[in-house]
Amino acid sequence: DVVQLIRGPNGSFVRLQIQPGNAPPGTQEHVLTLPRTKITLEAQAAKKEILKVKRGDKELKVGVITVPSFYQDYNARAAGDDEFRSTTRDVRKLLDEIKAEGGVDGLVLDLRENGGGHLSEAIGLVNLFVPKGPVVQLRETGGRVEVLESEDKAAAYSGPLTILVDRFSASASEIFAAAMQDYGRGLVIGQQTYGKGSVQNLYPLDRYALGQDPGYGQLTVTIGMYYRVTGDSTQNRGVQPDISLPSAISVEDVGESSRDSSLPWNRIRTSTFKPEGSLAPMLAELQRDHDVRVAGDADFRYTQAEIGAFESMRSEKSVSLNLEQRKADRERRTQQQLA
């Protein structure tokens, strides 16, 4: 219903009355006016940025590629366009540009808020960093297991790799992050991912109707489960990061495990695969370095304090009916945020 209210003619405007989720009672709402326009593939496409990071007396170049979704221009591909856009093609192009610009000392793939998309693109993206090998296992409801593999191609990038994830990284994002983790190819940083390990298919109901145009819609049916090459499912548990970052998003409130009808986690046999390496020996040192950096970073401390204040406010089970008391509480929280 909300989506239908937001949608409208191209060029028109929609006004949204917004109150932040962590705002105390009585906070004034903000009105946000947005122009309606057609969402293009370009707006959702992968993008790159080169950051210069100081490390001691050295200046390192770090490439950051943001991947909002696992997309593919199906219409262009169906029309025979050899230059159709896709996540894998666009990221490879960005990697080629980075190489042409002198390369980088490390690469970050940002999959935060990436809710997934085409499975084939997740497999293709893995292939840019890992040569041929199994990427994900698919078990159907009847028990048959299919191992989906990447092609026999040389990796487009073989340097240090980090994958950023959050609680909204789901489905294809989890498949990619899990493969990078299992192959020891990249360090996963962020929050526990969404935990969507089930496979759905759409069945149009009109095919069973007798009328000309009944408009019965379609039915979404779960037909299987995804599993990592290790045999573990991503269902409910998602992908656990190697290094955790603070987040105000509650795992209990957001994610597949928060749903009443969520399927349980399970595992199957491990697929045969050869890890690219192992990050385990350096994880303890990385965690120590991370803890030291967080302790000395004012922005991190502020973020953690805000999260603590938000958790405290969310745990409150009652609100004062006295207006002056509510105003005083709001002012106190505001001062805490500014401190």
Features from the language model and the residues they span:
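A general structural signal for short secondary-structure boundary/capping elements
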Residues: 153-157, 210-215, 266-273
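Polar, glycine-rich mid-to-C-terminal structural blocks
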Residues: 184, 189-254
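Conserved functional hotspot residues or short segments at active or partner-binding sites
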Residues: 229-339
